[in-house]
């Protein structure tokens, strides 16, 4: 239950907020309506982006989803000692729980907190933290950005220590030592601690340095599948496909962005698909179950 399911829409509108897409009147024949108004607030960077043209609210599932997974991680962390099993198995599960909590808070602080700057982090706003394993009515205050990153780092270090100790061999569908190193490299990159980011990235490469030769793929093939040796951890496919599936006629891939790649760049025919004359993201098929 602590893992994010692949039918959960969390980051639906993030791509709309980048320069990677453009907007236009819907020309996709399968979807008759023009739904640009649904993503207007995000595309135009409005103060309250969840509001549509009509005044209706878009569902923001990230807040609810991540905090619900944090609650499950809290239960595992606080109550695992009462469970049956070997100490090694418990330690490994505990390492996964600390990873998931760190991951969820890291995603939340980047969605709802301010960008990390060391000089202002002790005053900038971060996010609320909950370490209780039961639900009760109370108000949680937002921690500073510095404190938010400190708490995430604490969980991340505990996760790495436990997963290094157990060092279980796992599939990409379970959190592993390599996945923890990867999250640490991303965490320190965002914190602008580049030496630590490089150090953990090097640790990832000692475990898996395989590259996927996308030049061998056809236009019908997808990049993120079980055959891709670069994937270290995966938990579903929904976020990869939702924008392309639901908004392809209104928010296609930006032609300026697409044309910035060399004509012979294999990414132009593997990461992007031509669908009814519109360029859409084509990283994975809806039934691949891969989102790494």
Segments (PLM) and residue ranges:
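Conserved, well-structured interaction surfaces
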Residues: 35-112, 143, 161-168, 292
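Hydrophobic-face positions in mid-chain alpha helices that act as interaction patches
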Residues: 4-13, 17-18, 174, 198-292
